[in-house]
Amino acid sequence: MTNTIIEKAKERFAHTHESLAREFGAIRAGRANASLLDRITVEYYGAPTPLNQLASITVPEARVLLISPFDKGSIADIERAINESDLGINPANDGSVIRLVIPALTEETRKELAKEVKKVGENAKIAIRNIRRDAMDEAKKQEKEKEITEDQLKTLEKDIQKATDDAVNKIDSMIAEKEKELLTV
């Protein structure tokens, strides 16, 4: 029973890490990356549709994204969605494909993005601590219901704390890696 608490917590930690990696992927680092467009939805025939379901996205050069719509009639809708997004990138429409040239980041922009990385990372740490709290509460509940002894509870709490520390350390290394990526020119 005690192992299931730790296993559940570790599974939730892994989901938090995956979510953080996705969020970091959406923060542009001056290089073209198709994941920059993951959060863009296009109003297509009246329904919000993810961009990656309407077009293939390729990276022909280091700072260029090429969007090739499956339906050429959707090109204006895709262009509008990109313009309305918070990417700050102007699409170039040549009638059949859309090119996005990722501008080089200024020093000021790099520092702003690094702050954003820290903020997103801190939110992930809060999620980890909430998972730890839930696991600790579950362990105390089991001890209260006499499913585990007090000694088993103490051991379980130590194991939960160690798993939490490992998860937080992984987040710290992910933050440091993304900041390094952003701040290197």
Swiss-Prot record:
One of its GO terms (biological process) is translational termination. One of its GO terms (cellular component) is cytoplasm. InterPro entries: Ribosome_recyc_fac, Ribosome_recyc_fac_dom, RRF_sf. Gene3D superfamilies: 3.30.1360.40, Ribosome-recycling factor. SUPFAM superfamilies: Ribosome recycling factor, RRF. Its main location: cytoplasm. Keywords: Cytoplasm, Protein biosynthesis. GO terms for molecular function: ribosomal large subunit binding. It is found in: Cytoplasm. Pfam families: RRF. Responsible for the release of ribosomes from messenger RNA at the termination of protein biosynthesis. May increase the efficiency of translation by recycling ribosomes from one round of translation to another. Belongs to the RRF family. HAMAP family: RRF. PANTHER family: MITOCHONDRIAL RIBOSOME RECYCLING FACTOR PSEUDO 1, RIBOSOME RECYCLING FACTOR. This is Ribosome-recycling factor. It comes from Streptococcus thermophilus (strain ATCC BAA-250 / LMG 18311). The gene is frr.
